[in-house]
């Protein structure tokens, strides 16, 4: 994905001239950036006091909405299990890819009517995105619980014969059932010791039924064998078996329990499949909603900051730059030359040092022109 710089500068004789000047400066210098106009409608200005307060509120709203956008995108990646191409296909805004949406940005008059005050518009955005955030938490929690329960059951049916569930491996015929005196045990026998098992199992304790052991299953290291003996000899048999590196598994053949476990696994698997489609659709729709809201917050911030810096009547041009990554420093210098006259205190600053104690982010990124970054790198793939 990519990064944009959203900037504004005061209109020269016309706003078109401001735009042409920037475009010429960035294109003649080895194409430092792809530039386009960023269209912001005539919003209601309100009073200076309101604008100053709103400037701080919008900074917080910007960070909050960006956080929600990233959370929805990241959860989409989790649900699609990090299939990167598949995730990018679903991260759209208004049905188009994010770069297209930003570069062709048009204010959504229906969602955010410009007859409303700036504060009202920001509150509409905050309310909508808070709802998305809350819905995401509850949907993610429900889906994660389902997925976690299914994974726990699947984990039981995986792994070595020493730890995995044996219910899927054994059959009723492998056991002596409903006997008052006899019981069948399941024993994990290392492959290296299998010959010892055959020679010894009948004598590990008294009252072992001769020739009652068969191999029921195997994995890389071990065989699973059954053996039938008298109930009262079980403790002695377990003890002697352990001494000879044969491990008796705790297992009782119970058809009802095994059937219930299988049904539970099928139910969870079916529920997960049922929820997957609607969840991905919800994430897709609400990612779009949140991303659109985020770019509108950026537009509001540019508008408010431009009025505060450049004064009334409203006369500025908002412009979008997609910088060439190799020439970021050069682009900063060109912008500095173009706009340093706007603020004498910033005339000596191109990039504020990052390590001045007490310097907050807004000061770090202070330039003589209005500047906000839009970073579309929304995902962290594991």
From Swiss-Prot:
GO terms for biological process: proton transmembrane transport; regulation of macroautophagy; synaptic vesicle lumen acidification. Ubiquitous. Keywords: Acetylation, Cytoplasmic vesicle, Hydrogen ion transport, Ion transport, Membrane, Synapse, Transport. The modification N-acetylthreonine is found at residue 2. The keyword tRNA processing does not apply. Transmembrane segments: none annotated. The keyword Electron transport does not apply. It is found in: Cytoplasmic vesicle, Secretory vesicle, Synaptic vesicle membrane; Cytoplasmic vesicle, Clathrin-coated vesicle membrane. GO terms for molecular function: proton-transporting ATPase activity, rotational mechanism. Belongs to the V-ATPase C subunit family. This is V-type proton ATPase subunit C 1. It comes from Homo sapiens. The lineage of its organism: Eukaryota, Metazoa, Chordata, Craniata, Vertebrata. The gene is ATP6V1C1.
């Amino acid at each position: 994905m990519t990064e944009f710089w959203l900037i504004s500068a005061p209109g020269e004789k016309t706003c078109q001239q401001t735009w042409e000047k920037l475009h010429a400066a960035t294109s003649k210098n080895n194409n430092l950036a792809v530039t386009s106009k960023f269209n912001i409608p005539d919003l209601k200005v309100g009073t200076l006091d309101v604008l100053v307060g709103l400037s701080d509120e919008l900074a917080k709203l910007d960070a909050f909405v960006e956080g929600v956008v990233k959370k929805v995108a990241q959860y989409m990646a989790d649900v699609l299990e990090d299939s990167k191409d598949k995730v990018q296909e679903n991260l759209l805004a208004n049905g188009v890819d994010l770069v297209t949406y930003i570069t062709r940005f048009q204010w959504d008059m229906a969602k955010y009517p410009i007859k409303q005050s700036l504060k009202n518009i920001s509150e509409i955005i905050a309310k909508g995105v808070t709802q998305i955030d809350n819905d995401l938490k509850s949907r993610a929690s429900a889906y994660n619980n389902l997925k976690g329960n299914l994974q726990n059951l699947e984990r039981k049916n995986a792994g070595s014969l020493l730890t995995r569930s044996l219910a899927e491996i054994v059959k009723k015929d492998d056991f002596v059932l409903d006997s008052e005196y006899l019981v069948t045990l399941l024993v994990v026998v290392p492959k290296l010791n299998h010959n010892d098992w055959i020679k010894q199992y009948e004598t590990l304790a008294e009252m072992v039924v001769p020739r009652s052991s068969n191999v029921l299953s195997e994995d890389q290291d071990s065989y699973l064998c059954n053996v039938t003996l008298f109930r009262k000899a079980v403790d002695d048999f377990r003890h002697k078996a352990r001494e000879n590196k044969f491990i008796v598994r705790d297992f009782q053949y119970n058809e009802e329990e095994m059937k219930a476990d299988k049904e539970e696994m099928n139910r969870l698997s079916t529920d997960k499949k049922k929820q997957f489609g609607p969840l991905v659709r919800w994430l897709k729709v609400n990612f779009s909603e949140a991303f659109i809201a985020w770019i509108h917050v950026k537009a509001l911030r540019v508008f408010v900051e431009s009025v505060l810096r450049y004064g009334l009547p409203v006369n500025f041009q908002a412009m979008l730059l997609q910088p060439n990554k190799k020439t970021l420093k050069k682009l900063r210098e060109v912008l500095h030359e173009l706009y340093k006259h706007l603020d004498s205190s910033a005339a000596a600053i191109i990039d504020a040092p990052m390590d001045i104690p007490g310097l907050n982010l807004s000061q770090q990124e202070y330039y003589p022109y209005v500047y906000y970054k839009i970073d579309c790198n929304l995902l962290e793939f594991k």
